[in-house]
C-alpha cells in the first residue's frame, strides 16, 4: 500500500526538518555588536538576517545613540560592555580603531570569539598579542577584510592566474576613523 509506505517517510521528513531547526537553533552562535555607528548598524542588520547567528544585541558607549538605534531598529541595547559580552558567544567589534585592542582583549579573556573591523589595531604588537590570546584561549578571530566578496574582485578572479600586469588606483583618501 502506497499510503503505508509514504506516510512513515513523510513523517520522518517532518521530524527531521523540526530536528534540523532545533539543532540549528542549538548550534547558532549568539552574537553581539560593539559599536552602533554607521558600520555598526550595517553589522547589526546583517547579523540579524543571518541564519548562522542569533543576534542578542549591541553596546554603544553613547547611550543616547544606543537608545535611538534600539527604538529605530528594534535591536536590544545593552548599557554596559560587560553585560553584552557576558550574554554572547561571539563579539563583533565595530568601534573606532583606537578601542579595537581593548574590546578584543576584554572579549577574549571572557572566552568569546571575535570579529574585528579593519584595521585590526593601531600597532603590529597589539595585533600579535590578540592573535596570541586567541591561540591561548582556543578561540577564533577574524578581521573584516571582505573585499574578496566584492563583485569586481569576483569578476576578475580568473584573470589573476595569468596576469600581464595589474595596476590599481585608490580613488578615495584614507579615512583613519
Model features per residue range: what roles?
Residues 6-27:
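Hydrophobic alpha-helical signal peptides and transmembrane signal-/tail-anchor segments
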Residues 147-177:
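Predominantly a Rossmann-like dinucleotide-binding segment in NAD(P)-dependent oxidoreductases
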Residues 43, 73-131:
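Beta-loop-alpha module in the N-terminal Rossmann-like domain of NAD(P)-dependent dehydrogenases
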Residues 129-146, 163-168:
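Rossmann-fold dehydrogenase core element
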Residues 28-72:
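N-terminal Rossmann-like dinucleotide-binding module
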Residues 56, 89, 164:
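Conserved acidic residues
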Residues 96, 119, 144-146, 169-171:
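Histidine-centered beta-alpha loop that forms part of the nucleotide-sugar donor binding/catalytic region
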Amino acid at each position: 500500500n502506497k499510503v503505508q509506505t509514504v506516510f512513515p517517510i513523510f513523517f520522518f521528513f517532518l521530524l527531521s526538518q523540526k530536528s534540523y531547526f532545533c539543532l540549528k537553533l542549538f548550534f547558532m552562535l549568539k552574537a553581539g555588536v560593539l559599536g552602533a555607528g554607521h558600520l555598526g548598524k550595517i553589522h547589526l542588520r546583517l547579523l540579524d538576517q543571518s541564519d548562522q547567528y542569533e543576534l542578542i544585541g549591541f553596546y554603544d558607549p553613547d547611550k543616547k545613540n544606543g537608545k535611538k538605534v534600539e527604538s529605530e531598529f528594534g535591536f536590544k541595547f545593552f548599557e554596559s560592555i560587560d553585560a553584552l559580552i557576558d550574554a554572547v558567544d561571539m563579539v563583533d567589534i565595530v568601534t573606532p580603531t583606537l578601542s579595537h585592542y581593548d574590546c578584543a582583549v576584554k572579549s577574549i579573556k571572557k572566552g568569546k570569539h571575535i570579529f574585528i573591523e579593519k584595521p585590526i589595531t593601531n600597532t603590529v604588537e597589539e595585533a600579535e598579542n590578540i592573535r596570541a590570546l586567541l591561540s591561548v584561549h582556543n578561540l577564533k578571530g577574524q578581521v573584516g577584510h571582505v573585499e574578496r566578496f566584492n563583485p569586481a574582485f569576483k569578476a576578475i578572479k580568473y584573470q589573476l592566474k595569468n596576469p600581464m600586469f595589474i595596476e590599481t588606483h585608490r580613488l578615495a583618501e584614507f579615512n583613519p576613523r
